[in-house]
């Protein structure tokens, strides 16, 4: 008989092992009309709790400066959203009844386990990390979501890192089911003292591409002028709109093809260029937008941001988009170029499959198009527990303790890195 499918549950304990948080997943999908709810369970040692309360907080923050620059009480960090939940003692009117997974965990863990629940607002940004430079230390810049559980008499009471649990989650988007129209653009260049023109037309074979999938750029040139096109450059550029105190746009080339294809006067030219944007070719570019990163996992170029119509862009943190630029280098006539916007995302997984990891860290990689190529092999994810989906009984649940701190020999002060 085959094995029953397992339910993956993430587990993390405080350094003093008095508090443990359980989550069914760490990636929460933004469906544009709603966001997956954050539901989990916190287990607390009653002898440690005493007369205190158990609080869980969800924070969305935008770090826009290096952590080592935080001096004199100034922090290069802005909290975009903070929500608090009192897990114990339970409030008289809980926001919703426990989910099926919470019920199973509560039965397994006993009376000292308590559920918590958060709703992520739709207008919050997705998790994005800005790639640090080779010499940068500390937490990377970008947008992240963090769950923190602690025991205290009140929310205002300061808790020690040793007595709390911090766990980073991600808000993600997947490719839409119905892609947009095929991107195309054209332009005509007229030169001084001449009535003849140079016409450039470019198009992509589709609008939506998956990470690792090559782009086919169709370039058609009609040169009725007296100028000569010396070479053709095709590049993919990432645009990151940083919306914080003011809006600024940063662009970074992530792939480029340059060919010495010449187009003589009074002639035409047509060619398909293939180009693939990959993070593996851009490891040294500081400030490049990446999908939100969890420690011990690799990631990929940031997915395109899909904004719901009417959303307030001022609170969106980082908006990511991509364009293909086709440029003709003309002798003694300047450059002629067009841009083609496209969407770069992960495919939407099936409901019964766990949310996909980045290409180089996918425990269960999503089904990609035949042309989509993962970058590297997948390591084993040890930060999870699995139990069988037996709805009749929960006696067969087996927890696999996540003991990375003890295995690595880390000290309590190292716990400040919440990505572990």
UniProtKB/Swiss-Prot annotation:
Keyword entries, A-Z: Cell membrane, Coated pit, Cytoplasm, Cytoplasmic vesicle, Hydroxylation, Membrane, Nucleus, Phosphoprotein, Protein transport, Signal transduction inhibitor, Transport, Ubl conjugation
Signal peptide extent: none
PROSITE patterns, alphabetized: ARRESTINS
Phenotype for residue 295 to A: Impairs interaction with ADRB2, MAPK1 AND MAPK3; no effect on interaction with MAPK10
GO CC annotations on file: clathrin-coated pit; cytoplasm; endocytic vesicle; nucleus; plasma membrane
Superkingdom of this protein's organism: Eukaryota
InterPro entries assigned: Arrestin (IPR000698), Arrestin-like_C (IPR014752), Arrestin-like_N (IPR011021), Arrestin_C-like (IPR011022), Arrestin_CS (IPR017864), Arrestin_N (IPR014753), Ig_E-set (IPR014756)
Location, primary (coarse class): cytoplasm
Tissue expression notes: Found in a variety of tissues. The short isoform is the most abundant form in all tissues.
Compartments where found: Cytoplasm; Nucleus; Cell membrane; Membrane, Clathrin-coated pit
Residues covered by region (Interaction with AP2B1): 374-420
Pfam entry (one): Arrestin_C
Keyword Mitochondrion among UniProt keywords: no
Phosphoserine: residues carrying this PTM: 360
Region span, Interaction with TRAF6: 240-409
Sites of Hydroxyproline modification: 176, 181
GO molecular function: angiotensin receptor binding; inositol hexakisphosphate binding; phosphatidylinositol binding; phosphatidylinositol-3,4,5-trisphosphate binding
Subunit structure: Homooligomer; the self-association is mediated by InsP6-binding. Heterooligomer with ARRB1; the association is mediated by InsP6-binding. Interacts with ADRB2 and CHRM2. Interacts with PDE4A. Interacts with PDE4D. Interacts with MAPK10, MAPK1 and MAPK3. Interacts with DRD2. Interacts with FSHR. Interacts with CLTC. Interacts with HTR2C. Interacts with CRR5. Interacts with CXCR4. Interacts with SRC. Interacts with DUSP16; the interaction is interrupted by stimulation of AGTR1 and activation of MAPK10. Interacts with CHUK; the interaction is enhanced stimulation of ADRB2. Interacts with RELA.
Similarity comment: Belongs to the arrestin family.
Domain note: The [DE]-X(1,2)-F-X-X-[FL]-X-X-X-R motif mediates interaction the AP-2 complex subunit AP2B1.
The protein's name: Beta-arrestin-2
Species per Swiss-Prot/TrEMBL record: Bos taurus (Bovine)
